[in-house]
Amino acid sequence: KVCIVFEGRDTAGKGGTIAAITGKLNPRQVRVVALPKPDPRERTQWYFQRYIAHLPAAGELVLFDRSWYNRAGVEKVMGFCSPEEYENFLRETPYFERSLGDSGILLLKYWLAVDQAEQEARFAERANDPLKRWKLSPIDLVAREKYRDYGKARDTMFEATHRPGAPWVV
């Protein structure tokens, strides 16, 4: 049971990295999870609940293209969660991840980094390429102005959730 979390700024290459990995593996034992924003029912649940159904069973590899760490990044920076929800997330995540390990799930967490100049170049490429334009969202355009805020949120997330058994790999 292997669960790999890919996180990083927009345009960091999460989707491309996942495609490169899964292209060489047996699709019967590999799943990619990229959840949309929570629906009204999911917003009433325990925060981690919507992710649990997607965790791997024996013999499976699950790759998350973004994950529960949305709360520490986009939700925090864009104001989609309350300060209390954010603090609860930072406090609860190490316990949640420890329980995954205790149940036999190997959790690997990767942060893909891209600097601001490269991110801007990739945003421009997406905007100008009809085959990539679908990747741009209104949130992406607002988030571009919050590059430093995302960096601070990332650093706080690393400090709260980097631990033996589930370290971040940058």
Regions found by a protein language model. Give the residues of each.
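Glycine-rich phosphate-binding P-loop
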Residues: 5-22
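A glycine- and Lys/Arg-enriched "phosphate-lid" helix/loop adjacent to the NTP-binding pocket
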Residues: 76-90, 101-152
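Conserved nucleotide-binding/hydrolysis micro-motifs of P-loop NTPases
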Residues: 11, 38-41, 67-70, 113-120, ...
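Pre-Walker A (Motif I) flank of P-loop NTPase domains
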Residues: 1-4, 59, 166-167
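Conserved catalytic network of the ASCE P-loop NTPase/AAA+ motor domain
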Residues: 23-27, 53-57, 99-105, 161-164
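A structural signal for short, well-ordered beta-strand segments and their strand-loop junctions
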Residues: 5, 62-65, 107-111, 170
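Glycine-rich ThDP/TPP pyrophosphate-binding loop and its adjacent helix/strand module
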Residues: 99, 145, 151, 159-167
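Conserved nucleotide-sensing/catalytic segment adjacent to the nucleotide-binding pocket
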Residues: 28-91
